[in-house]
């Protein structure tokens, strides 16, 4: 299966954090569809493996917070997870929305934007990374994704998928993120707000590394980060932050 060609988007960019999560249930197909419709440059989502080897799009290690069921994702089969309602806790109008698999996301949206994939657990012998690579090749999106994670994920990426883009989160809660990004040969790093300043951004850019920020929902805050050189901002408030990025892209006042 081959995705349509995706033209590179200019920087600065807006990354829809778990989709358009301010308006829709996070990490669901409606949330991603809304982000596509609004014109997000990238979607960020999280992956956990199920007990029977499916790559499930969900942030937490358990179903408890975002669905009407309980249980640890890694200890449950996909059929059990698919039976959980991932919409109703966000609002009655979302009843019936389910947590998708990675394949479901790419069936719907491959070729429409880039994907920032936060791998929470690389799996035994890098299973998650190896399957992610296999699916990316199947859906023709290898050049439309990058994988974010801490040290165990970065090490598995270097071992099992060195050709795929990496985004370093290791050192995010400190001042050594850029050094870790260089160590893991990453094309991107993702700063946390409190440890992001112009000097760190310049250091990353000097090393040829693209800089993400996690996160900004306030338009004025987003504008300040764009002004000091951040390349991409993760946000839950897509409708509010997207116009700020477009002003920065085209030099509008």
Where are these regions (language model features)?
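Phosphate-group recognition and catalysis centered on beta-loop-alpha active-site segments
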Residues: 1-253
């Amino acid at each position: 299966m081959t995705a349509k060609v995706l033209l590179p988007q200019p920087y600065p960019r807006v990354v829809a954090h778990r989709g358009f999560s301010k308006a829709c249930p996070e990490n669901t197909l409606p949330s991603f569809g809304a982000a596509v419709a609004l014109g997000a440059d990238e979607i960020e989502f999280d992956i956990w493996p199920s007990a029977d080897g499916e790559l499930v799009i969900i942030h937490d290690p358990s179903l408890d917070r975002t669905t009407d069921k309980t249980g640890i994702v890694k200890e449950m089969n996909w059929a059990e997870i698919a039976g959980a309602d991932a919409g109703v806790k966000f609002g009655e109008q979302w009843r019936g929305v389910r947590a998708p698999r990675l394949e479901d996301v790419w069936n719907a949206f491959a070729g429409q934007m880039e994907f920032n994939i936060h791998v929470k657990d690389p799996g035994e012998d890098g299973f998650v990374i190896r399957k992610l690579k296999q699916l990316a090749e199947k859906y023709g999106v290898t050049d439309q994704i990058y994988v974010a994670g801490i040290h165990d994920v970065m090490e598995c990426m270097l071992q099992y998928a060195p050709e795929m883009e990496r985004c370093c989160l290791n050192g995010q809660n400190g001042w050594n993120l850029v050094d870790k990004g260089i160590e893991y040969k990453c094309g991107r790093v993702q700063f946390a707000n409190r440890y992001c300043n112009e000097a760190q951004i310049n250091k990353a850019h000097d090393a040829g590394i693209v800089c993400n920020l996690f996160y900004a929902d306030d338009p004025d805050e987003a504008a300040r980060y764009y002004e000091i050189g951040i390349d991409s901002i993760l946000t839950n408030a897509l409708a509010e932050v997207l116009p700020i990025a477009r002003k920065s892209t085209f030099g509008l006042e």
